[in-house]
């Protein structure tokens, strides 16, 4: 039995069949994008349908970029979200204010680039339930790129393959260019609380591929099992 279970968020779902498949293969969370320029954007009416299909034990995450409190409340009038993800330039005070008004936990995304002070960022957003680390690109979103994992503070990483992450680490959600081919290495190196994937499970931008979704979830579970076996060996 692995000592660590990596949670899995499949983001940017737009079709009912995608949500049904995510639930069937054991995803812990799905992500719905409420940022109109994104190819994965979903209108409120469609999002409400998708969220209801997720059922009671899958976290439904709403991704917002520089949205106002009124924007978020308008979505929540129809969409039963259970987690907010702020993916723009929102300051900590605004994130906490919006989440407090609607009574939901929240994540804050950081687009990682050389020179970024992740420890200072984590301190500023200490009231978030987790930090999502994504690749930096112009605009918003990671664009399917992997960022340099050596930029993650060493005190946040496991001290050896057989040990969990240290208590100094925030709840990290690792994103940015993940796929079934590289997620095992990410888990072994970073040991994140969760992994988040979007483009890595697509056949084309905004079009999810069920075989890739299945392969990604399988790769995460196998990586967790391998880490558990190495601890017990």
UniProtKB/Swiss-Prot annotation:
Its Enzyme Commission number(s) read 5.3.1.24
User: One short Pfam family name for this protein?
Assistant: PRAI
Q: Name one GO biological process term.
A: L-tryptophan biosynthetic process
Q: What is this protein called?
A: N-(5'-phosphoribosyl)anthranilate isomerase
The keyword Cytoplasm belongs to this UniProt entry's keyword annotation:
no
Report the superkingdom from the record. Bacteria
Which cysteines pair up through disulfides? They are: none
- InterPro entries per the UniProt record, alphabetical: Aldolase_TIM, PRAI_dom, RibuloseP-bd_barrel, TrpF_fam
Q: Give the reaction(s) catalysed.
A: N-(5-phospho-beta-D-ribosyl)anthranilate = 1-(2-carboxyphenylamino)-1-deoxy-D-ribulose 5-phosphate
Q: What pathway or pathways are given for this protein in its record?
A: Amino-acid biosynthesis; L-tryptophan biosynthesis; L-tryptophan from chorismate: step 3/5
Q: What class of enzyme is it?
A: isomerase
GO molecular function term, any single one: phosphoribosylanthranilate isomerase activity
Q: Which UniProt keywords apply?
A: Amino-acid biosynthesis, Aromatic amino acid biosynthesis, Isomerase, Tryptophan biosynthesis
Family recorded in the similarity comment: Belongs to the TrpF family.
Species this chain originates from: Ralstonia pickettii (strain 12J)
HAMAP family attached to this UniProt entry: PRAI
């Amino acid at each position: 039995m692995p000592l660590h279970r990596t949670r899995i968020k499949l983001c940017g779902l737009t079709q009912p069949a995608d949500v049904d498949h995510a639930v069937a293969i054991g995803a812990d969370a799905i992500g719905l994008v409420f940022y109109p320029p994104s190819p994965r954007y979903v209108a409120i009416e469609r999002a409400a349908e998708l969220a209801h299909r997720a059922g009671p034990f899958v976290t439904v995450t709403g991704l917002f970029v520089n949205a106002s409190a009124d924007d978020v409340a308008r979505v929540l009038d129809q969409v039963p979200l259970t987690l907010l993800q702020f993916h723009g330039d929102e300051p900590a005070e605004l994130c906490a204010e919006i989440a407090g008004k609607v009574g939901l936990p929240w994540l804050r995304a950081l687009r990682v680039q050389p020179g970024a002070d992740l420890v200072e960022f984590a301190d500023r957003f200490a009231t978030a339930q987790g930090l999502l680390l994504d690749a930096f690109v112009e605009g918003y979103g990671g664009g399917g790129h992997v960022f340099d994992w050596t930029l993650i503070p060493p005190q946040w990483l496991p001290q050896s393959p057989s040990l969990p992450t240290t208590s100094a680490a925030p709840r990290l959600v690792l994103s940015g260019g993940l796929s079934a081919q590289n997620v095992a290495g990410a888990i072994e190196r970073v040991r994140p609380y969760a992994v988040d994937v979007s483009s890595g499970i697509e056949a084309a931008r905004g079009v999810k591929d069920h075989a890739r979704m299945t392969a990604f979830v399988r790769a995460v579970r196998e990586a967790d099992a391998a880490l558990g076996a190495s601890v017990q060996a």
